Amino acid sequence: MNCSPPGSCTDTERQRSGTPATPCATLAPTHPLRQANRLPIRRIKMLTAHTGHLLHPEYLQPLSSTPISPIELDAKKSPLALLAQTCSQIGKPDPPPSSKLNSVTSSEKESGRSSSLKLGESPLEDKSSFKPYAKGGETRKESGSSAGGAADKAGFRVPSGSCQPFPHAPSPSSRVSSPGQHCESKNNESQEKKEPEVNKSSLETSQANPTLTRASISNSSAESSQSGDVAPSSKSDPPSLGSGHVAPISPYKPGHSVFPLPPSGIGYHGSIVGAYAGYPSQYVPGLDHTKSSLVGNQLPGTLGLPGKPPSSSPLTGASPPSFMQGLCRDPYCLSYHNASHLGSSSCSTCVHDPSALKSGYPLVYPSHPLHSVHTTLSSSVTPSLSGHPLYTYGFMLQNDPVPHICNWVSASGPCDKRFATSEELLAHLRTHTALPGADKLLAGYPTGLGSAASCHLHLPPTGPGSPNTLPGSLSLRSPHTFGLSRYHPYGKGHLTAPNGLPVPSLPAGSYYSPYALYGQRLTSASALGYQ
């Protein structure tokens, strides 16, 4: 018998039963008639459940670009909807401001603005103008009249293809009203080069940010207070470049007066003269005295450089990279920077003019790929110098009263003390090598050879008959066969030198190298590009 679920019994039920009809509502809940007509609870929940908690298909799909979306409307209430909205926008280009949130959040903000922004720009105004992925045409096109308003923006300026070169005459619109900043228009040969130059409107950043001056000279802050115009005839000062001037990519390109050297008031002593004299001419084209006075107007003629005292080093100043590579920190290198013995030791201005030196003082400056010493020493130095075992510099003086110089390099710099004889120098070197057990090592060296030769030049004995004579071909490094006589802790007991002479059994053998004591510093210096 069927009964309508919530209502009373029907007439057909009364006729079939033949009994007085009893309403279904009056039946007990446990009556079999009511239990047979009940719907399962599962179906009731599926029919009457609120569908707002189900997962919307918009969560599983990328957010459409419709102006109003249910997620966007619910983003203010539900954090999950806000997260879904944020995740769906990852990787998408920024839409124009009139499309997405115009009718919801930014209608009053964007009403006063023009909606003609490009696709790659954000709706709100970006205070930082550094756009690394911006195209060339998307950089801000600001005129000279709005230069003062945008001068307080911090950030970088990306040079675009639409940047115009420096004008040949200064105009009022090209001036910048920012204090401490003068954009100087150059009327020299650097205008015609095809170097990327920054637009005048992109030079509005203040001088307080040092990274904004892309490749300007280091003293541009001191020169920014000068007058704007620099004529080619008034080149007595170093070239006063504006802080926004883009230096050429190669500082050695001919025709440029831009050269990263200190002004003429800061000179170098004799070693940089040797570097200038030893390098090919194509490395120093910008040092012409008609173009710049960085080294003074004396360099092409006399190579005279006033300035620093002899104790100073050119490594302390700014130098071109090729000169820094030529200035070797190795005391055995031919271009070692300590060249104070080129002139008299009491010179005050240290003007090392090669014409002022004696003609008997040969200056041996090899070419930059350092050749062996004997190619220069055998031809230019008298045989008396070959008896100086501790003097391995490339430039040697014949009449020097104290020819022996301690070339020990420590953390504070080279020692550079002078001695008349090699014995005094050896005694002085023992003060540097005062390590535990070092006196025992030095005492056991072959006395006939002289510990100076084995200590510094790494030269094996020439024979039992002539122990004090050195080979004619001096070498800066030891021969490749002499390294076989080093002490090997697990090898055979007594090793012999290459010439067959037995060497006393010492913990260091017959090979005592000063490089073992400061070799780590030399390798770090060579890694820095000094060697």
Swiss-Prot record:
One Pfam assignment: nlz1
Q: Where is the composition biased (Basic and acidic residues)?
A: 183-198
Q: Where are the zinc fingers (C2H2-type)?
A: 404-432
Feature: compositional bias, Low complexity: 19-28, 113-122, 216-227
Where does this protein have compositionally biased stretches of type Polar residues? 1-10, 171-180, 199-215
GO molecular-function term, one example from the UniProt record: zinc ion binding
Q: Where in the cell is it found?
A: Nucleus; Cytoplasm
Q: Which UniProt keywords apply?
A: Cytoplasm, Developmental protein, Metal-binding, Nucleus, Repressor, Transcription, Transcription regulation, Zinc, Zinc-finger
Q: Where is this region: Disordered?
A: 1-28, 88-249, 295-318
Q: Which domain of life is it from?
A: Eukaryota
Q: Name one GO biological process term.
A: negative regulation of DNA-templated transcription
Role, per record: Transcriptional corepressor which does not bind directly to DNA and may regulate transcription through recruitment of histone deacetylases to gene promoters. Regulates cell adhesion, migration and proliferation. Involved in specification of the lateral neural plate border (NPB). May be required for segmental gene expression during hindbrain development.
Q: Which family does it belong to?
A: Belongs to the Elbow/Noc family.
The molecule here is called: Zinc finger protein 703-B
Protein's organism: Xenopus laevis
